[in-house]
C-alpha cells in the first residue's frame, strides 16, 4: 500500500463500531531505498506513538478513557498511516470491552498485525493521568546560535566535523526545537524537537542547526525524516556512536516520536514536551 491510497486528505466516515480493517499499513522499504538502505539496517530503535483520544464502553455501557502508548520496533516492515490509526482508535468509542486488559490485548494484536512485528502497548487510565510527566529534551540547545539560514530542503553538505587525526573524540547531546517537515500526502506541517547524542569527531554546531532547519520545506513522514537525519550525520560526520530522537507535536490526537541509534542504550524517556 502507498500513502496516496490511505485515508489522508479524503472525506472521513467515522466507524460506529470497532473495526481493525481501518488500519492502513505503509511499507518502510520504499523510503529506505531512497536513503540507500537496501540490506541490513544501519540502526535500530523504536517509534513511540502516544494516543490521547482513546475511549470505549465497559460491559455495562459506561464510557472509559485512557492514554495509549505504542512501541513500534524500527525493524518492523510497515508503519501505520496516522489518519487510519486515528480512525481505528475512534472505532472503539461505541464498542463494549470487559476490561482494560481486553482493550490492550486487542490493540496489541491489531497494531502488531498491521506493522508486521510485535508492538508493545501501555494504557494509562484516567485515575493515573496525574502521574504523567512533562519535560524538555536534555542537551545543549543549538537554537541559541545567532546565524543566517537560507536552505530549506535537506542538504547534508551543511554538515561537517573536525577531521584532525590528533583531535580527541567528544561526547555531546545537542537539541533543537526548530525541526519542521511536511506530510507527503496533505502538505500539512509537522513540528518537532530533535535530540542528537554522539561520540566522535566534534560536529560543527552551526552547520548542524542549518541542516535541521533545511527540513523546513521537506515532505516526509516523521520516521523517514529521523532516519534521514541519522544517515546524513553518520555519512558526513562519521561518529562512532549516534542516537537521534525526535518528538513531534500531535495531530488527530496522536504524537509520533521516532528514535534511532547504532549502540545499545535504554529506551528514551517518553515525557511530553511543552508543545506536545
Curated annotation (Swiss-Prot):
It is found in: Cytoplasm. GO terms for biological process: queuosine biosynthetic process; tRNA modification. The active site is at residues 183, 190. Its EC number is 1.7.1.13. The lineage of its organism: Bacteria, Pseudomonadati, Pseudomonadota, Betaproteobacteria, Burkholderiales. Belongs to the GTP cyclohydrolase I family. QueF type 2 subfamily. It is an enzyme of class 1 (oxidoreductase). Keywords: Cytoplasm, NADP, Oxidoreductase, Queuosine biosynthesis. The keyword Cytoplasm applies. Catalyzes the NADPH-dependent reduction of 7-cyano-7-deazaguanine (preQ0) to 7-aminomethyl-7-deazaguanine (preQ1). It catalyses: 7-aminomethyl-7-carbaguanine + 2 NADP(+) = 7-cyano-7-deazaguanine + 2 NADPH + 3 H(+). This is NADPH-dependent 7-cyano-7-deazaguanine reductase. Homodimer. Substrate binds at residues 80-82, 222-223. It comes from Burkholderia cenocepacia (strain ATCC BAA-245 / DSM 16553 / LMG 16656 / NCTC 13227 / J2315 / CF5610). NADPH binds at residues 82-83, 251-252. InterPro entries: GTP-CH-I_C/QueF, NADPH_dep_7-cyano-7-deazaG_red, QueF, QueF_N, QueF_type2. One of its GO terms (molecular function) is preQ1 synthase activity. It comes from the Bacteria. GO terms for cellular component: cytoplasm.
Amino acid at each position: 500500500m502507498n500513502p496516496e491510497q490511505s485515508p489522508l486528505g479524503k472525506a472521513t466516515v467515522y466507524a460506529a463500531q470497532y473495526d481493525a480493517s481501518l488500519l492502513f499499513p505503509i511499507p518502510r522499504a520504499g523510503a529506505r531505498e531512497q536513503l540507500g538502505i537496501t540490506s541490513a539496517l544501519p540502526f535500530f530503535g523504536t517509534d513511540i506513538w502516544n494516543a490521547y483520544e482513546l475511549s470505549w464502553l465497559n460491559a455495562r455501557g459506561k464510557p472509559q478513557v485512557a492514554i495509549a502508548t505504542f512501541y513500534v520496533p524500527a525493524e518492523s516492515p510497515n508503519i501505520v498511516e496516522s489518519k487510519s490509526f486515528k480512525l481505528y482508535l475512534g472505532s472503539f468509542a461505541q464498542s463494549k470491552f470487559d476490561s482494560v486488559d481486553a482493550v490492550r490485548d486487542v490493540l496489541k494484536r491489531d497494531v502488531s498485525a498491521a506493522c508486521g512485528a510485535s508492538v508493545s502497548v501501555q494504557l494509562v487510565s484516567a485515575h493515573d493521568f496525574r502521574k504523567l510527566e512533562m519535560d524538555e529534551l536534555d542537551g545543549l540547545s543549538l537554537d541559541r546560535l545567532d546565524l543566517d539560514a537560507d536552505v530549506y530542503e535537506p542538504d547534508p553538505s551543511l554538515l561537517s566535523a573536525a577531521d584532525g587525526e590528533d583531535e580527541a573524540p567528544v561526547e555531546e547531546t545537542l537539541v533543537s526545537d526548530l525541526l519542521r517537515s511536511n506530510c507527503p500526502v496533505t502538505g500539512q506541517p509537522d513540528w518537532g524537537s530533535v535530540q542528537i547524542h554522539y561520540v566522535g569527531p566534534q560536529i560543527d554546531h552551526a552547520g548542524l542547526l542549518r541542516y535541521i532547519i533545511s527540513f523546513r520545506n521537506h515532505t516526509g513522514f516523521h520516521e523517514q525524516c529521523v532516519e534521514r537525519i541519522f544517515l546524513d550525520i553518520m555519512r558526513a560526520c562519521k561518529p562512532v556512536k549516534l542516537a537521534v530522537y525526535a518528538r513531534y507535536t500531535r495531530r488527530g490526537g496522536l504524537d509520533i516520536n521516532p528514535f534511532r541509534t547504532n549502540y545499545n542504550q535504554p529506551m528514551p524517556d517518553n515525557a511530553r514536551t511543552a508543545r506536545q
